[in-house]
Amino acid sequence: MTARKLPLTRLARHTQRQFLQMLLWKVEVYFPRFFSEYHTVKCLLKNPFFTPIDGNECWPCQDLKAIVDLSGHVDAAEDYTLSGTPFVVRDAVRSELSLELMQKILRGHQEILEDETSKYESTLEKVKSLRELISHWSSDHLKTNAYHIFWQTNSVAAARILRKTFPRPYFVPKNTEVSLERSFLIDGPQEPSYTLPQSDFANTLLVQVEGTRIITLDPSDYCSRNCSSISILMKPNDMLYYNNQISTPRSVPSRLTDAPSIAYMSSFY
């Protein structure tokens, strides 16, 4: 019995497929972080013609003069969340947050430090990794006036650990999906103004862990003709809700204290 011969085109495609599989396997073996960084990315290439909302949907920020405090008003907070109107509450965080608590969480869970899906950025030359951040937490490196550190995790293990300290707020509907993406922003007391990163889902929660910062909600490009900017001073344990399709948040130094600012960001659908 003679072996069946494949047509030349099919043979060429088969060879190309084998070569591509071998090439990708080599990349995965020698550059595992290349795949882990993009594994959880929902969109690698954005559509420049896509607009999530139009001007008619910007009514939650029209004529808004201030960010209202809805502490203790559960029903009102739920209504504001459904409409996308920004507000702040000061009774949603159950435990007293502090720099020491965050240090304890990071040191007590090795899996967070070994998470290859996390992102870490720092303007401090001596604090270029999460491990260096822990080791220099009380050193002079974090006593400078102006610096910015950004740490973002996107793993199930990290979300499970952080959920114990930052549980789902009472005004977030139980049938909503909470993103795995969690971010920390650490700023020196004189760190200049900067735009906060866009959260995974539109409904965004920002918790002030320690220190103070002024958060200015500028209207997004879609709502710039309908809305104006509003600001709020964030103090420890304050939780701010906003919709990132309606508002573009900026973090501004408050100049009220010499302590660094630590903020925690999450989002839900």
In which residue ranges do the predicted regions lie?
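N-terminal accessory scaffold of Fe(II)-dependent oxygenases
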Residues: M1-Y241, Q245-Y269
